[in-house]
Amino acid sequence: MNPDFTGKWKANIENSRLLGPAPKELLITISHSEPDLRVNMAITTVDQNTRYIDFQARTTGESATNSVLDAAWRSRLRWMGSELLIESWANQSEHELHFCDYWTLSSDRRVLTMEHRNDDLHGQITVLDRVDVDC
């Protein structure tokens, strides 16, 4: 049985390894009812600007296109054992980008880890703590 990532999550910036400037806050709301996944992010920078990202796709491996930061991102989601791989391609600021973001959920369902491997953000790990009460 695959993990259910549904919940409200807050990035633990101190426990994460982020490439580039760290945000002041990263909040993520996930709605996951297999095979549908919907992600809403609110990224607040240190100068208090907040950007919102909405993303939706299916975990069946079919391609989905979302508008992310004013660019079309093509993504494919698939299960790799108990990890969810979100593979995305985008052309951002005239650069072709490739991302392989592996999601894992702790056994107590309180910590979501998003780890980039073998991609343009290789080595970045975002650790998120559950902030909703029901899990």
Segments and roles (model prediction):
Residues 1-135:
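Hydrophobic small-molecule pocket/channel-lining residues, especially in calycin-type beta-barrels
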